[in-house]
Each structure stands twice: as structure tokens, then as C-alpha cells.
Amino acid sequence: FKLYPLTYTELEQYPQDLDFDSVFRTYHLKRKKIDQERLYELLWTGFYPRVYDKHLDSYKWYENYIFTYVERDVRSLLNVRNLRTFEHFLILCASRSAQLIDYSDLSNALGVSLPTIKEWISLLETSGLIFILPAYFENFSKRIVKTPKIYFSDTGLLCHLLSIRTVKQLKVHPLLGSIFETFIVGECFKRFY
């Protein structure tokens, strides 16, 4: 099994409901007013427990996390000749969070083969950095062939990869809507996977 970053309800210590419908209930929100500033701060800081347990500077922590991930994990799991290209791939994926995956576009932008891009996406998914949300259609065949969306499992990591260095920058960032969508979909995903 995979351990994803904390959910908003875990971090804010709300009671945990295990059924899907509970995600859409608002009774637990009445107990505590959601502070918009706190929400921006959480989106920027992300939800990895270590940042909160150790009271770490989240931006530096994500920098080290990415370096360790790329240097250790990627190097050992894949035969990546140019780690810098993989880092650019991570950044391009971040810029496409909450969007349809366009493998060809990633391939062309990086000058890397399509099978390599698919292998790298699979690695990100297997390691829990991203998750893929299949298209939903009542027709099962359409679900299989339609393009899925890519989401990062943590908004702090996403913000770091997008070079968002402060909460103030997050508030005016052109991808704020995608970051917020990543947060909402991620909350649903992390509760049930």
C-alpha cells in the first residue's frame, strides 16, 4: 500500500468518516470556520507530516525531497541518462496538474520518446507523487479510451515545482485554480486509496 500525505481533515484534526458521501457533508465544517488565509497557507505548505512534526521550512524541505527523490530513487529505478531532463519533466508535469495528460506534448517539449514519458509517468504514479484520474463516462469503453487527468498528491510539492516561494505568490499565481482543484480531488483520492 502507499502512504500519501495527510488530508486536510487529518491535519486539522476533524473526525474521520470513511464513507464517500461524508466528503460532501458540511456538518464538521460548522464546528470550525475555515480561515481563507489558513487554507492558502496549507495549500502552499502541503501536507507531508514531516514538515509539521519537525516544524521545518517547507520550501527547503521540498527542495531536499525532490533532490533525494531524483538522485536516489529515479537513478536506481530507471536508467535516466540526464537527471536534469527528468527534473524538467517533473516541472512540466506540475504545470499540467489538474489537466488532461498529453504524453505527446511532454515528449515534444523535452525531446524524449513517448514510451519514456509513459514510463516516467508510471514511476511518478507508483512512487505516490502523482495520481491519474481516469475520465468518467457511463459507457465503460469510453472510460478506457478517453484521456485521464494528472494530479499531484501534495500541493506543497506542486507549489515548489512551480517555483511559488510564498503564500503571497500563490494567491496571484495563474495556476491557482489548478492547484485548488488538485487539493480538492486529492482530498477525495487520499481518503479512499
Give the ranges of each region predicted by the language model.
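Amphipathic alpha-helical "lid/sensor" segments that cap RecA-like P-loop NTPase cores
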Residues: 28-65
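Accessory nucleic acid-recognition modules appended to NTPase machines
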Residues: 52-193
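Conserved AAA+ ATPase "sensor/coupling" helix adjacent to the nucleotide-binding pocket
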Residues: 14-23, 68-69
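A generic structural signal for short hydrophobic patches within well-formed alpha-helices
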Residues: 8-11, 157-158
